[in-house]
Regions:
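Short acidic, S/G/P-rich loop/turn micro-motifs used as interaction or catalytic elements
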Residues: 26-29, 80-87, 120-122, 158
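Well-ordered, non-membrane alpha-helical segments in soluble/globular domains
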Residues: 30-38, 90-103, 135
């Protein structure tokens, strides 16, 4: 099944793809409501009934998907663009969505991929230029709820003025890029494996692919 679905000559979709796009911005609670409806359509919640002092309680204890082989991955691109929740500030809004994500992860086993775009200020860039090849992404605000925290960095960006990165020479003596599609991916936090870990890849944006970087001797 195509990821984006199938379309006829008029551009009309004739078959749904694997990806469901939510184009309109929304707040965390509205997204949670959509996910709740999706979960109910594709499975059933399991409750345990108990009675105390004559009052009946239904406690949520699990979720059973109709298709146990189906993986549900929710990608938020990007997290800071969520609409404010009840007048919350940005951090409070992000924290609320993270809280909801943990609920669905723990109960429904949904996987959440939160994307955050970071823009360094000019003053910060100038300060970090002196680090040269020691420059690599770090986060001082790692979410305790994340299983894995990855960062991606473009060492070829002119504003960083790097000559080498993690021991890899980036430019020829004439200033030409040796690895024009180079990106470095960094596993900075993990609950399930050793970290940090660092990886070099070629990012081919046109085809949305990553390939291994072969270091030139």
């Amino acid at each position: 099944v195509p990821l984006f679905g199938e379309y006829n000559e008029k551009g009309e979709r004739i078959k749904k793809g694997l990806i469901i796009f939510l184009e309109n911005k929304d707040n965390p609670t509205s997204v949670r409501n959509w996910l709740m409806a999706y979960a109910k359509t594709n499975g059933e919640f399991i409750y345990k009934t108990s009675i105390k002092d004559g009052v009946t309680f239904n406690r949520l204890i699990g979720y059973k998907p109709f298709n146990p082989d189906k993986f549900v991955i929710i990608i938020t691109d990007h997290l800071r663009k969520l609409l404010p929740e009840r007048g919350f500030k940005m951090k409070e809004t992000v924290d609320k969505f993270s809280e909801y994500a943990v609920e669905f992860r723990n109960v429904c086993k949904f996987t959440f991929v939160h994307i955050i775009h970071l823009n360094r200020s000019i003053s910060d860039i100038s300060r970090r230029q002196f680090d040269d090849d020691k420059l690599f992404p770090q986060s001082d605000d790692i979410k305790e709820t994340g299983n894995y925290i990855f960062t991606m960095f473009n060492p070829n960006d002119d504003k960083f003025n790097l000559k080498k990165h993690f021991g890899t020479i980036l430019r020829t003596p004439q200033g030409a890029l040796i690895y024009p599609n180079l990106r470095t991916i960094h596993l900075v936090e993990s609950r399930h494996c050793f970290c940090p870990q660092h990886f070099r890849v070629n990012m081919i944006g046109e085809t949305k692919k990553f390939t291994e970087v072969i270091i030139k001797k």
